[in-house]
């Protein structure tokens, strides 16, 4: 029983950390990354479609993304969707390819992005703590029903706390890496 609760909590905490890492990978740094355009949705014959389903995105150099649209008639719609996004990008067509140069980040924009990343980190920490609370509540319910002893309850809470500390440490490490990446010129 307790081991199931512990495993469930560990899996959920790991998912919180992975979701945070995935979320901050989409935040633009000075470096080109195909994941930057993951959130772009293009109107494809009246249907909102993710860019990844309509084109391949590759890194041409450290400051340029190259988009190869599978259906050439969709090039204009892809460009329009990129411009409409709040990423501040200005794509240009070159035949069947679309090039997206990434302008260097200003100091002010870097600080804004750092604040956003810190906010995401705090949300991830809160999510991890909520998982801890849920696990501890389940164990307390078992204690009330006299299915486990108080020693088991205490031991379980200590284990869950260690898992929580480890997950928060991972979030903090990812945050520090992203902040360092954002502040590089």
Curated annotation (Swiss-Prot):
Keywords: Cytoplasm, Protein biosynthesis
Disulfide bonds: none
Subcellular location: Cytoplasm
One cellular component term from this protein's GO annotations in UniProt: cytosol
Main location: cytoplasm
One example GO MF annotation: ribosomal large subunit binding
HAMAP family per record: RRF
Function: Responsible for the release of ribosomes from messenger RNA at the termination of protein biosynthesis. May increase the efficiency of translation by recycling ribosomes from one round of translation to another.
Similarity section: Belongs to the RRF family.
Name of this protein: Ribosome-recycling factor
Organism expressing this protein natively: Klebsiella pneumoniae (strain 342)
């Amino acid at each position: 029983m307790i081991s199931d609760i512990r495993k469930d909590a560990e899996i959920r905490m790991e998912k919180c950390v992975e979701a945070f890492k995935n979320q901050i990978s989409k935040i633009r740094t000075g470096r080109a990354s195909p994941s930057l355009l993951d959130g772009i949705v293009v109107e494809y014959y009246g249907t909102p479609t993710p860019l990844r389903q309509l084109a391949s995105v590759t890194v041409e150099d450290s400051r340029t993304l190259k988009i190869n649209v599978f259906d050439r008639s969709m090039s204009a719609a892809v460009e329009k969707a990129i411009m409409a996004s709040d990423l501040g990008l200005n794509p240009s067509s070159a035949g069947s390819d679309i090039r997206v140069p990434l302008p260097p980040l200003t100091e002010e924009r870097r600080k804004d992005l750092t604040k956003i990343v810190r906010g995401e980190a705090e949300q991830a920490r809160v999510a991890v703590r909520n998982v801890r609370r849920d696990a501890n509540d389940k164990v307390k319910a078992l204690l009330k029903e006299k299915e486990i002893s108080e020693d088991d309850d205490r031991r379980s809470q200590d284990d869950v706390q260690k898992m929580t500390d480890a997950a928060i440490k991972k979030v903090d490490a990812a945050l520090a890496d992203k902040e360092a990446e954002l502040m590089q010129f």
